[in-house]
Amino acid sequence: MTGDGSAHISKNNQNQHKDRFKFIVNDKSILGPQWLSLYQTDGKVTFAKSHFEQAMMNVIREPNINSTVILRADILKEINHAAEAGSEPKFDESVLKKFEIDNGNESGEEDVKKINIEDLNIRSCETSESLKLSPVHEFVRRIIPRNFYKDAIINQTCLILNSKDPNFQETSLIVYTPHINSEKDCPFYIPRTQSVGILLHQSVLSVHYIPFPEDKTAFTDESERVVRTAYRLLQTANKHSKGVMQGYEKRVNHDQVVNKVNFQNTYIVLKKKYSKFLVENWAESTDPKKHVFEDIAIAAFLIELWIKVYGPDFRSKMQFRDLGCGNGALCYILLSESIKGLGIDARKRKSWSIYPPEVQSSLKEQVIIPSILLRPHPALKRQVPHLEHNGRFFPVKVTHEVIAPATVVYSSEDLLKSPQVNTAEFPPDTFIIGNHSDELTCWIPLLGHPYMVIPCCSHNFSGQRVRFNVRKRSPRSNEIKNQNNSKSTYSGLVDHVEYISSRVGWKVEKEMLRIPSTRNAAIIGVENATLKHFPTQAVYDMIWEDGGAEGWIQNTMSLLKRNPRNH
């Protein structure tokens, strides 16, 4: 670009890239002598200023789009100058928010890194008078990195500037200026510059820097990280502006149930406390990083959900049961956070032995047989109050490498008394967790307690693998996407768990969890007007409607001798 305000194709550097961007470091920046040109689109873009500004407004609020090192941004100050003509820009003091983050570190071994986070003053930026740019929207945002024990939290001014020149009505400039005093303060997740400018001018998109005075030579080398970052910034601005123009809508909407900021803060604290121990001592054959960080995220979500449902003192008001607890990592985290509860699984896992004794004692090797399969129907119970079981018998075939195949017959009375069986008759203050709990997934909404279930594999009430069809199509249906060929299978399972929940009276909420898994839909039931009367007739009807539960006990008892599955 040239200083007279027209789009300019560099004569000094004709480097072409796969995105048809040009490296223009040898060209004078149109923004002024203090600015350095880096990249521009080779030719005119097809999107308008309105598309560009809408896209960049989203990037300002969601800086993790540009860097995976960034967790989020908290908007501390926002001033919109684009008010009615003649009116003064208004700043609502209530918009000013200070988000404090608990170190979560009792030992004082490490502190959260922060730089100038008290500085909330908007930083202005000089630009060429030829463009007649002035701010229309000003922000101060606080950038929170994923690991704020390693990378510093900073504040940053974000400006959207438009031209007052009638010839440049489609000109728009986005400027990022970190609130730091020198290059050495610059955190890893932003380019080492005083300011970054992303300019749309005469339908050409370009990126410019104001370098620190002591460092200008590195910008001529495209292999330098700070230069590569400029390229990526242009990529993002170009891609997202095109997306707005084409009417792109987000496929998944997160944070529908639990506040995003609270969840992320809790996640970071839990990650700091527990990830190192769990990864280093992992005893399973599965990938520790995937499972550890997934369980930490689920624990963070549950804690924030419980605070929302029961209040800050939730620990004194509830306890959990993790059905199908697997490796026990989720239970370990929750129990270590002084939350009462038990984990139950059909098979003890190797990882259980790495936990402290008080955690190990809360992990139970039992199979789940819902009491509804063993107890008399409530109507019969009212007529015969002393009746404790339904008098049924259940033949189970067993095989052994030494003796011939045989059949063991269990009575409902035997199973109710067996220490190997858990009938899911929990205290009234219990909250049930079903984290990829397979055969138990569809059962959990029927057990008469608030719950969160994260479906994984489809099984019916008999424990058999089945495929459920999606009952309805809604705008949310596209949220349930698996990246393998079983998209419709998973969609059907999630939809069916929602249906079961509604069928028996639950007010259903759904959250797409921020976990490293394609099977990340959480179905949550907290409110149910009929809860005191469970199991209701609707529960029996739901089991009957789905084909009954014949075979559940036989299939469940056979789990006692089967190797555990991994997910």
From Swiss-Prot:
It holds the Pfam family AdoMet_MTase. Disruption phenotype: Increases cellular ROS (reactive oxygen species) levels. Increases RNA level of TRM3, TRM7, and TRM13. Sensitive to oxidate stress induced by rotenone. Mildly slows cell population growth. GO terms for biological process: tRNA methylation; tRNA nucleoside ribose methylation. The keyword Kinase does not apply. Its main location: cytoplasm. The keyword Transferase applies. The modification Phosphoserine is found at residue 107. Signal peptide: none annotated. Its EC number is 2.1.1.211. It comes from the Eukaryota. Keywords: Cytoplasm, Methyltransferase, Phosphoprotein, S-adenosyl-L-methionine, Transferase, tRNA processing. Disulfide bonds: none annotated. It catalyses: uridine(44) in tRNA(Ser) + S-adenosyl-L-methionine = 2'-O-methyluridine(44) in tRNA(Ser) + S-adenosyl-L-homocysteine + H(+). It is an enzyme of class 2 (transferase). It is found in: Cytoplasm. InterPro entries: tRNA_uracil_MeTrfase. GO terms for molecular function: tRNA (uridine) methyltransferase activity; tRNA(Ser) (uridine(44)-2'-O-)-methyltransferase activity. One of its GO terms (cellular component) is cytosol. Belongs to the TRM44 family. Present with 7720 molecules/cell in log phase SD medium. tRNA (uracil-O(2)-)-methyltransferase, which catalyzes the formation of O(2)-methyluracil at position 44 (Um44) in tRNA(Ser). This is tRNA (uracil-O(2)-)-methyltransferase. It comes from Saccharomyces cerevisiae (strain ATCC 204508 / S288c) (Baker's yeast).
